[in-house]
Amino acid sequence: MTTLASSYDPSSFESRLYAQWEAAGYFVPSDTGEPYTVLLPPPNVTGTLHMGHAFQQTLMDALVRYHRMRGYDTLWQVGTDHAGIATEMVVSRNLALEGKGETRDSLGREGFIAKVWEWKAASGDTIERQMRRLGTSSDWSRSTFTMDPQPSAAVNEAFVRWYEQGLIYRGQRLVNWDPVLKTAISDLEVENVEEDGFLWSIRYPLADGVTYEHIEHDADGNETLRETRDYLVVATTRPETMLGDTAVMVHPEDARYLTLHTARIVLPLTGRHVPVITDDYVDRAFGTGVVKVTPAHDFNDYQVGERHNLPLVNLFTADAKIIDPRKQYPDDESPFVNAGIDWRELDQIQRKRLGQHLAYKIPAQYIGLDRYDARKLVLSELEDLSILVETKPHKLQVPRGDRTGQVIEPYLTDQWFVKMDALAKRGLELVESGQIQFVPPNWINTYRHWMENIQDWCISRQLWWGHRIPAWFDDAGHCHVGHDEAEVRAKHGLGAEIALHQDSDVLETWFSSQLWPFSTLGWPDSQAMAERGFARYLPSSVLVTGFDIIFFWVARMIMATDSFTGQVPFRDVYITGLIRDAQGQKMSKSKGNVLDPLDIIDGISIEDLVAKRTNGLMQPRMAEKIEKATRKEFPDGIIAHGADALRFTIAALATHGRDIKFDLGRAEGYKNFCNKLWNATRFVLMNTEGARFTGVPQPRTEAEKWILARLDKVTAETHAHYANYRFDLLAQSLYEFAWNAFCDWFVELAKPALNNQDTDAAASTRHTLLYVLESLLRLLHPLTPFVTEELWQQVVPRLGITTATISLQRFPQVGDVDTSGYATAEADVEWLKSMVSALRRVRSELNVPPSKQVRLLLQADTADERPRVARFASQLSFLLKLERIDWLDAGQDTPPSAAAIVGELTLLVPLEGLVDMDAERMRLDKEIKRVKGEIGKCNGKLGNATFVQNAPAVVVDQERARLADWTTQLAGLREQRGKL
């Protein structure tokens, strides 16, 4: 007797099975067979699993399990990232919540870092526990943390090598600066948000008595104004930065300003003279065609400043207040700038000193003001001077830090950079030569665009948590780079009497992440490389990641791996879309639409779900709105679906598009799919009690041959879909075979044989049921590992299989069963299915009870179908509850019947005795009258021009859809009435 539970309850076995798998070491690389390696994009160590993680990890796990079952030596390299900024914020927030008065600054660097390690120890394995719950089949003994000793050594080695090769340098450049965190951040950490702002137009007086003829025209080209002006009008969205202007620019071909190419203007509020320059960057059609240039506070202006050798005036402190130049640059009130030197002839040192000197021209009343307070004062003083021409509303793209929400400042600081030109050229060659394949291939265009427009990479961050930059400075400011201080002293002959201090900055996390493909394999330590299989597992087989980090991570891994190892990091890059909610909105805490994958797996009450979505909001005022929306969408919370239902849902949604809408209803449907598989297995087990088989079935019935042929085809489709990373088509193929072919049809078609006195047919059918079910479980296992393992353990003893786990059982192959002679059987069973479907449809339309036997009459122009009907008569009678099957001769009168057509056959079901003819006619006539009335209402509305023209388009479309539905219903009712 089967010991399989009577109902599908994933909570009763999923955690148990995972613990068994891990304890048995099934996920450890085998060291035999062809290597297959997958890299996990390392999530933040203090983070939790979100839908994006679950989506990509499900696909990775399916690939790993599939290849493990095919005999590959699989390594799924997992681990976590130290996530500098995110982790510092989490720990700082927790210090505040503890209420002990401890802060980052009060603890100091060493004390704070100790707190971070404490936090990592307490909560750092949360995400790994969650990954286990999802079914991640990785060797956890190889899990790597980017701050572990081995990866940290790799970071130092990479920095030193690139520095010695001249690829890493320290310089003053413009970076994205978060004035709250007081650190540079990457482009990926900046969100451009459309906001309402203003565009201010300001008069900049021309210097040296210069004037020009200003002419304006209307839309038809007619002159509307001509006057002599001694000023230029400049429009800006950031008037406070005018204090740092070092030029204004016009287009070289703009006829309005041809006479001003050598002019200067007097910068309002400061009295400084700055040049008018010409540059093709200017859009002549925007505003007045005159643009202020502030190289130290705008990325585009910075590029202009580089082209024209303009000085850079840094206005702000690290927390976005106006600097006090006498404190910032105490030695740089330099007299050389008054000696008549042309700014275009300055070298870099002179240019820097000039920028610092010009900061002394900032009016005293601005020093120490916050940037927005400075803006107010600038506007007030411009208005007092009557040179604020216009203020008008303007839509702005405001750069905000994704963690603090603060406006990011383009900020001039000394940072460490990597020269990217040569690295990018090589990285592009590796992809375009085909050594690395992108899937879908259109993402190569995105990769190419980024690589061809690359800029030097700012790798330093003003944080404490992270890999500290291996550079030491002496008191004279000389920089020395090495693996440690001892090496620096030995290499440069620096005695103990020379004081050295290490750079306080750390490397941004992408620097260590770019080394992930080979630092996890022991590089650069030769012994560790041998132990961890560097030569065997690099390059990895595939990287599964999102399109949003193609440049920030994928490209950098390609460049770094080639630079340090001479190899590519991976063969394939499978780019997934981004998970959004069912309405296509980005999932975010602030919108209150985040779905926790573990809540889908294990379920959550509505109260707990509301608490999870409303606690810790950056905008607490949104809590009420989020709670209301959550209670409306999930009035009873979220039911438990189990990991397999979530995984299958993810696979089914994994199209090759940019955005993927996650619909929880799909998960409910795939939970039903798992339940269907469970019940089908119970049927098979109950009907094969005591049976023992080995080898491949020798089918005796057409139904067996049909299902074996279908199994061979779905096996071929499965391999093809894995090869092409089409998880959506994979899920569709397996679903169709499991639900329709096996559960709905073969289980039904097997019943006549199982209940037949032909013992050979019954035995072969039992064998085929077990064989196909076992093969199906293996086909499904990479996507739904838990339910397939639980069912497989019940099935395989009856097939003589002794392998301990389905995860190590050989994956089905095309040709496991020779189906070359099964074409006729396939055609016959497809015909049988059509017959059964047609007759069941008739019974349903006539509301004939399932247990009621009916008579079937058949008509055909030829006798060709008679032998096939005779062969399948017993199956038809069993499946359709047929009293008898009779043939009508040509011209023979037919009784009142319901009819259906299958090929050349007409199927007739006599109505006498099945329905009350008079009552059924009355019912249908009444229903037809009602539907006609509804159609009349729709036609009345749609025939009313006022309604069609004035009603919202969506309302009109709904009315048209209703008309189509009613019309379809009427046709069906009339057809039924005609049969009576």
UniProtKB/Swiss-Prot annotation:
Transmembrane segments: none annotated. Its main location: cytoplasm. A motif ('KMSKS' region) lies at residues 586-590. InterPro entries: aa-tRNA-synth_I_CS, aa-tRNA-synth_Ia, Anticodon_Ia_Val, M/V/L/I-tRNA-synth_anticd-bd, Rossmann-like_a/b/a_fold, tRNA-bd_arm, tRNAsynth_Ia_anticodon-bd, Val-tRNA_synth_C_sf. Its EC number is 6.1.1.9. It catalyses: tRNA(Val) + L-valine + ATP = L-valyl-tRNA(Val) + AMP + diphosphate. Keywords: Aminoacyl-tRNA synthetase, ATP-binding, Coiled coil, Cytoplasm, Ligase, Nucleotide-binding, Protein biosynthesis. Belongs to the class-I aminoacyl-tRNA synthetase family. ValS type 1 subfamily. This is Valine--tRNA ligase.
